Amino acid sequence: ERDPNAVLLPRAGIVHRLDKDTSGLMVIARTRQVMDALVQKIAAREVSRLYLALGLRAWAGPKERDVSESIGRDARNRLRMAVVASDNQNGKTAKTSIKLLQNCEQGCLVLCRLHTGRTHQIRVHMAHIGHPLVADSVYGGAQAAGMVRQALHAEQLAFEHPVTGELLHFVASLPQDFKLALTNWELSYNGVSAKQAFSH
């Protein structure tokens, strides 16, 4: 339902963005007070954001890993972001925790937790570790498993309401194309709680 107050807020109350063609949850505030407070919470890393992603190639190595690589504009292609040296003036620190959920010969289903919110962060970090997202042509991911958009879904959001103090937790079920991709690769997903998601 359209909120008439949204026109009075910057960016219509949108607190953070999702990449084009990424499915799932997004936070939209209804008042300026809440919007400003939520923007601060995200900057202070007080908002838990969990994403599901399908990466190309079978996962190898530890089931959990942290990718802490700075991200900046790709010098060769201004439409892309890239991992850059930490002393690069155009780079911003970025950290993603990645956990393997399911694996097969063609690729892997992973859960990603954002510690920072850089443009294309999960897509860049997954490509950097050798698992570009399925159908993410910008970062080298070929179409597979029936997916025609990058296989990235913002599944869970959790934060404390800035006014009431209530702990809020939202979950968005997988869209049909993502479910079909899992079926095509003979993978399954039955959900994971935010508390059980990562060991650290």
Regions found by a protein language model. Give the residues of each.
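RNA pseudouridine synthases
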Residues: 1-200
